[in-house]
Amino acid sequence: MNIDRFLQETIRKHMTLEDALPTKMPEYVNSFGYFFGTATLSSLAVIFISGIILAFWGPDWWHFTSVGHFTNSVHFWAVEVFYVSVTLHFTFKFFKAAWRDGRWRTWINGWLIWGISIFSGISGTLLQANWDSQWNAQQGKDAFNALGLSFMNWMNYTTVLTLHVVFFAFLIAVLVVAHLTFVRNESPVRPIVNEGKDEK
Ligand code: HEM
């Protein structure tokens, strides 16, 4: 098997260059509702950039340096913006019934990202390294033990740090790339009011 040929054929089969890097959009995309997906994506970019800076200088420097405090706050507030945007995003997509015409993959993939982002957020709060986070980790571990997931030790700071900065971050990045690929491949769903009218 030739991997490059396989990739070439798969990309060519599913996406043109205009799909991948569109220069035009349907008129109905000129609506404020479409801003929420972009806002989610932008806040995620800020989360990743500030998170990489936080992780770069070790697990606690953000508690005792002014640059660390600032970066930590940027990371925290980007997460707040992310959750507000993603909630508005999927609410808008729900009222547009954006899963229509085979877009169920984007819809299911979106819920997967959302579910993983909850675990990512929880693991983030456990990295505060204070009494509050220790209390939460201690209380939360019983729920995981009850689910048979006791191998995930939420009381171990290093495990939680790795889960947060490697495991969940990687899953979210991969699923977001898939999300955007599906959107580019399928194009934005048509408004409900116009459905079927063009064919008559
Ligand atoms: C990290 C989280 C997410 C990011 C970065 C993201 C980003 C985007 C972007 C940029 C678009 C294209 C622009 C737009 O239509 O607004 C889009 C479309 C879409 N998203 Fe998301 N999204 C996320 C989570 C979700 C969730 C949780 C759902 C629902 C459960 C969802 C469902 C959809 C659907 C169905 C579309 C296609 C809309 C259409 O065809 O018009 N997304 N997303």
Predicted feature descriptions by range:
Residues M1-K200:
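Membrane-embedded alpha-helical bundles that constitute the cytochrome b-like, heme-associated redox core
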